[in-house]
Structure formats: structure tokens, C-alpha cells
Regions:
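N-terminal targeting leaders of exported, membrane, and organelle-targeted proteins
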Residues: 1-105, 167-189
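Conserved alpha-helical segments that form or flank metal/cofactor-binding pockets of metalloenzymes
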Residues: 94-123
């Protein structure tokens, strides 16, 4: 699959896809509902092992929030309107990240050759334009460092940067999934 791998040090593994997905649907009404996403700062710690699943979920939500904030920082720097947070797109971003992690692949197409838009359409989700950025990072466990590395990688890749800074999109959902020492991130526009 088309991937670009950067290894800033021997203990980190990062990868972004070379060709972000963009699909236009000019005759479809609007994007799914939009909700604001609250900010939360929680990191996993050894004393919380009894609730590790819950702590991990909160940690990943923190990374999602930070990525969302960084997307809007980049859009503001570029003189663009900020994106609203879309919980419907968040659902599909989380599904995509978890599917890649659980099934050990890295591609816009799942193991059956389908984009996430196939599942969206099956669920009755409509949109005017759609875009997706995917990436994974290994060996990083700090929420801020993860969000920063994902955004740096995406902003240093022309197609991903174009998705983040596109005027075609008005909302975004972010999904992050951790399995082993890898963290997968998906942006659905």
C-alpha cells in the first residue's frame, strides 16, 4: 500500500498515507449533525490499572481533542474558518482507526477493498464532500506529543495538508485507537 514512513528515532515509528482520500458529492444535501467536543486532560497512570480500558478511552479522547484543536489552529493561521466538530464523522473515524489496528493494515480501503464511505452510505449518512487522512505512530505515549506528531506529519504532506485546509469541508471528526505500541489516527472531513 502507498505509505510514507518516517523514523525520527529508533524508538518511534510514524507513517502517513501518501494519497489522502477525497470524494465529492455535489448533489447530496449536507453533512451529518454537528456537535462541539469538550476538552479533557487525562493520561493513563499505573494507579488506574483497574479502570485501564476507561483510562485508555479518555486518553485517546484527549488525543482526538488535541488533534481537532490543532486542525483549527492551522486553519486560523491560513485565514480559513474553523471546522465544527462532527460526532457522526467521529464515529466513522473511530471505526476506521480501530479496524486498521485490529486487522493490522494501513490503507484507506479496508480488507474487503471498501472505503469507510461504503459503511456511511449503508447507514444512510450523506455528505457534499468527503475527505480522509490516516496515520499511525508507534513508541509515543504522551497525548500532546502524539497530537503534535500526527499534525506535523499531515501538514508536511501536500495531500493531507490540502484536506486540513480545504474550504470544501465545514466539519471534522477525529478517531484515535491504540493497540500495542501503535496509535492510529483518522480524520474524517
Amino acid at each position: 500500500p502507498p505509505t510514507q514512513t518516517e523514523k525520527p528515532s529508533t524508538d518511534k515509528d510514524t507513517s502517513i498515507d501518501e494519497k489522502p482520500s477525497i470524494e465529492q458529492k455535489p448533489n447530496i444535501e449536507q453533512k451529518p449533525s454537528v456537535d462541539e467536543k469538550p476538552s479533557e486532560e487525562i493520561k493513563p497512570s499505573p494507579e488506574n490499572n483497574s479502570n485501564l480500558g476507561e483510562v485508555n478511552d479518555k486518553f485517546m479522547t484527549q488525543v482526538e481533542n488535541l488533534i481537532y484543536e490543532k486542525v483549527n489552529e492551522e486553519r486560523t493561521k491560513a485565514g480559513l474558518e474553523t471546522l465544527s466538530y462532527n460526532t457522526t464523522m467521529e464515529k466513522y473515524a473511530r471505526i476506521k482507526s480501530q479496524d486498521m489496528g485490529d486487522n493490522n493494515y494501513f490503507s484507506h480501503e479496508d480488507l474487503s477493498g471498501n472505503l469507510i464511505t461504503t459503511q456511511m452510505k449503508n447507514d444512510g449518512v450523506t455528505y457534499r464532500a468527503w475527505g480522509e487522512n490516516i496515520a499511525y505512530i508507534g513508541g509515543v505515549s504522551d497525548a500532546n506529543a502524539l497530537a503534535e506528531q500526527f499534525m506535523t506529519n499531515w501538514m508536511n504532506s501536500q495531500g493531507h495538508r490540502e484536506n486540513i485546509l480545504s474550504s470544501k469541508f465545514s466539519s471534522i471528526g477525529v478517531g484515535v485507537y491504540k493497540i500495542g505500541n501503535k496509535v492510529y489516527a483518522t480524520q474524517e472531513f
